[in-house]
């Protein structure tokens, strides 16, 4: 019950931009709790010589609790800054491990609810909406997580979603996607094909989570 429309561009922007997954793999990105830990903010250090792209809804797992990126942004090279986030694991506030990319993004419903508050620059107010959306997802999928972690919901349907992804390919000049689910439409567009390719599976994986 989902329709996917590719967004193509024969003249993409030739920009050298680092994505978060690659940054972690290459050891060029460090993500940590702030010196005084707070739910709504984490520190991101970009040690690369290229700008680092953080995408709205992208999840990092570990530290005191899993978080999702509060809004899309570019972090300049050799820069360390605090960034706005939302908690995606309501039932944990104890250190687990260093942050890493969780390989998942918030599902489209969670991103949509969060965005309604973020338009008013209210990350704190959006936190309740994020938790409510994750709870709704657990009910929808008849799943359970001891810490109400968004990531746990995805891991329990990983095989089903992997089979689902096999039906969708990527065009050579594709830079984004439009997804229609029932009466809702969403889209994500990137500067070029290589960036979109890094996020393609993640976006489709969570479009109908």
Map each language-model feature to its residues.
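Charge/polar-rich, low-complexity and marginally structured segments
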Residues: 120-182
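Terminal connector regions
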Residues: 91-138
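Intrinsically disordered, low-complexity Pro/Gly/Ser/Thr-rich segments with frequent PxxP/GP/PP motifs
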Residues: 64-97
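Short, hydrophobic/aromatic beta-strand segments
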Residues: 50-58
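N-terminal, Lys/Arg-enriched amphipathic/low-complexity engagement segments
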Residues: 1-43, 94-96
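Conserved small/polar residues in nucleotide/adenosyl-binding loops
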Residues: 205-209
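Asparagine-centered strand-capping/turn motif at beta-strand->loop junctions
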Residues: 42-50
């Amino acid at each position: 019950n989902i329709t996917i429309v590719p967004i193509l561009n024969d003249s993409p922007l030739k920009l050298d931009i680092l994505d978060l997954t690659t940054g972690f793999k290459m050891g060029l990105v460090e993500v940590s709790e702030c010196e005084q830990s707070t739910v709504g903010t984490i520190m991101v250090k970009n040690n690369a010589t290229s700008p680092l792209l953080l995408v709205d809804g992208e999840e990092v797992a570990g530290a005191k609790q899993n978080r999702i990126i509060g809004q899309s942004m570019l972090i300049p090279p050799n820069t360390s800054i605090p960034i706005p986030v939302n908690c995606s694991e309501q039932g944990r506030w104890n250190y687990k491990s260093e942050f890493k990319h969780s390989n998942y993004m918030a599902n489209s419903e969670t991103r949509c609810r969060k965005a309604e508050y973020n338009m008013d620059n209210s990350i704190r107010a959006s936190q309740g909406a994020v938790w409510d959306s994750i709870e709704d997802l657990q009910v929808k999928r008849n799943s359970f997580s001891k810490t109400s972690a968004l990531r746990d919901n995805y891991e329990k349907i990983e095989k089903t979603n992997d089979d689902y992804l096999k039906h969708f390919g990527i065009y050579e000049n594709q830079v984004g996607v439009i997804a229609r689910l029932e009466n809702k439409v969403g889209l994500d567009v990137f500067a070029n094909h290589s960036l979109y390719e890094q996020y393609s599976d993640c976006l489709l994986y969570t479009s109908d989570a």
